[in-house]
């Protein structure tokens, strides 16, 4: 399998995973149907999920369509999940009163004395896979340029 195809498959997995996991995690009693959330907060979560799902569909289209500028298409497609997951690493530092934990009463898993936030683990995995996918694309592109 070529690096270009492997790259597109890996990036597709990240894009689909980003949309599907986000909807699956938020479409429940801890988020959208949480009775303690004000209706407008629920509205914003649904809007965010719709936007993410729509952008993910566009990213997949950009990734797999024939393009006169495949570098631009691949870069934009890669940025969709990367920009979605990035705030999981800094939002709680920038906005006081926010939390990575949906249910503060539920204990977090602890590994080597460090509390592990599942959201951050998922974000980290997706960011790493997106970087690997993009690197595969760029390394294929550089190899292709050298052969010309």
Enumerate the predicted regions with their spans.
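Core segments of alpha-helical transmembrane spans in multipass integral membrane proteins
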Residues: 22-23, 41-63, 79-86
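Alpha-helical transmembrane segments of multi-pass membrane proteins
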Residues: 16-29
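Individual transmembrane alpha-helices with interfacial aromatic-anchor signatures
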Residues: 80, 109-126
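Hydrophobic cores of alpha-helical transmembrane segments in multi-pass inner/ER membrane proteins
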Residues: 50-61, 122-134
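Interfacial segments of alpha-helical transmembrane regions
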Residues: 2-15, 68-84
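C-terminal halves and exits of single transmembrane alpha-helices
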Residues: 81-98
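Membrane-interface capping segments at transmembrane-helix boundaries
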Residues: 135-148
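Membrane-interface interhelical loops and short amphipathic "cap" helices
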Residues: 27-43, 100-111
């Amino acid at each position: 399998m070529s690096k270009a195809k492997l790259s597109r498959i890996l990036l597709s997995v990240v894009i689909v995973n980003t949309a599907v996991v986000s909807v699956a995690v938020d479409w429940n009693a801890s988020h959208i149907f949480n009775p303690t959330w004000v209706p407008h907060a629920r509205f914003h979560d649904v809007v965010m999920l719709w936007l993410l799902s729509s952008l993910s569909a566009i990213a997949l289209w950009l990734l797999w369509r024939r393009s006169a500028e495949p570098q631009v298409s691949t870069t934009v497609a890669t940025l969709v999940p990367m920009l979605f997951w990035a705030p999981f690493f800094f939002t709680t530092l920038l906005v006081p009163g926010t939390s990575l934990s949906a249910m503060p009463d539920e204990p977090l898993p602890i590994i080597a004395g460090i509390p592990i936030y599942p959201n951050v683990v998922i974000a980290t995995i997706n960011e790493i896979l997106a970087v690997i996918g993009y690197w595969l694309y760029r390394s294929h592109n550089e190899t292709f340029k050298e052969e010309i």
